[in-house]
Amino acid sequence: MEFSSHHIRLLQQLDEQRQKDLFCDCHIIVEGQMFKAHRNVLFASSGYFKMLLSQSCRDMGEPITATFDVFSADTFTAILDFVYSGKLPLSGQNVIEVMSAASYLQMTDVIGVCKMFIKSSLDINEKDRDGFFSLSDKDAGSNGSGLYAAGWRTESSPTHTHDTAEHGSFIAGYNYPPPITSRLQRPFSKHPRKPELVRKHRRRLLPEPLTPAPLSHIPLGDLVGGSAECMLHDEETVESVSQEEERTQTQESIISIKDEDEDAASHSWPESPQQESLDQGPALHITKAEELYKAMPTMLGGVSGWGEDELSSGRFKCPFCTHTVKRKADLKRHLRCHTGERPYPCEACGKRFTRLEHLRNHFQTIHEAGKLICRRCKLPVTKVTGRVIQDGTRRYRLCHACLAEAGLDNVNFDYGEDQPLVLPPENEREHCWNFKEEGRKENGSERAESDLAIQEVVDSEDDELKEKQD
């Protein structure tokens, strides 16, 4: 026999113990504020605490203290309340911070709840945006239709999103014709358009033909007096006139919207043909939003297109900021800055990273730094169990087993000692230097003697010439 309320009472008792500081053996410090909790509860709720507490399971008698600087105290308060009560206080201001902290603490349940909250808020915003791209308020006021005006107010008001058909809610896209009651109330145009021109614009603007609503389903109280009698006496004439008015009104409404909101119309989202799903209550709101906006991006998952303008221009915009990228993979990586997702865990220490290259650098610099590995078998070796081999200019390390298998007997072993430079003895060096200096002196003396001899010869010749002249 099972008691469904047993786990609820158990959580309540644990929460009361935490608030009264009873049996709390784990202290968490966030921004200088201390939070006390039970290590068993944290171990069962968070993957990060599970890894942290499993490493320090030997010190069971002393309380454990952990310090965090990656999130705020208010964010951790919300997460701690969720751990002990199962209730997560989310709002538009703290959903990103809570999701980032939950990703750091490896709490998948909290991440899933935050994803649903963000998706539902985006659905509401895009639904209001879709209502903005419906028929303008100017056209709705000129038609004078109370039924259409009620539908417009229902779509634009966020508090009455799920009205029933009894109150007359009606949602139409910008390419849908107004109800037939508004067309019958409006007086006929004095200058009707030519059928050829109407068919030409209709073929260009509306690829799919529009069929008027059946007149038999319209109550007589919604019609104006003369038009009701005309419908009863000559139904075929009214139907033909309504078709002509439908073409004219549709063309005018589409042209006016195209002129006024040409830029905004390209951003509109497609309407779902199942409009009656809005009348089924708030329970089907998420299903309806998924049907209307199938192009919505999913958080922490595959990112789909974000609008026709981005698909046409080849750029994708972040839904949280103004950052734009060219590839879906870049947008998915950028979203991790807002969501705090870390999908790449380290198998050695459990630390998680947002990018794969950061994980590789961490593993190489932290876990593989300073390790000597055999080049052949890739096993760790030491200076005792391995040797450094120098093959020409290449140097690598092999273990003794690989050396024996390879039969490397005639290989130069490099023990890490630099060979001394081979220089001649000091006596020989001095002799060479003295020899060079003596050679230079001898050459200089020979040159000096030759110069003196030349000068003496020249002087003697000059003296002989002077004597002959005298």
Curated annotation (Swiss-Prot):
What InterPro entries does the annotation carry? Answer: BTB/POZ_dom (IPR000210), SKP1/BTB/POZ_sf (IPR011333), Znf_C2H2_sf (IPR036236), Znf_C2H2_type (IPR013087), ZnFinger_BTB_dom_contain (IPR050457)
Q: Where are the zinc fingers (C2H2-type)?
A: 316-338, 344-367
Question: Which residue spans traverse the membrane?
Answer: none
Query: According to the UniProt record, where is the region Disordered?
Result: 260-280, 439-470
The reply on keyword Zinc-finger is yes
Which cell locations does it reside in?
Answer: Nucleus
Biased composition, class Basic and acidic residues, residue ranges: 439-450
Keyword Kinase, does the record have it? no
> Which ranges carry the BTB domain?
24-92
Any one Pfam family match given in the protein's UniProt record, by short name: BTB
Gene3D superfamilies found in the cross-reference section: Classic Zinc Finger, Potassium Channel Kv1.1, Chain A
Which keywords does the record carry?
A: DNA-binding, Metal-binding, Nucleus, Phosphoprotein, Repeat, Transcription, Transcription regulation, Zinc, Zinc-finger
GO biological process annotation, one example: regulation of transcription by RNA polymerase II
Coarsely, its chief localization is nucleus
* Compositional bias ranges of the Polar residues kind: 269-278
GO MF terms here are: DNA-binding transcription factor activity, RNA polymerase II-specific; RNA polymerase II cis-regulatory region sequence-specific DNA binding; zinc ion binding
Q: Name one GO cellular component term.
A: nucleus
Its biological purpose: May be involved in transcriptional regulation.
Name of the featured protein: Zinc finger and BTB domain-containing protein 8A.1-A
The organism encoding this protein is Xenopus laevis
Q: Which gene encodes it?
A: zbtb8a.1-a
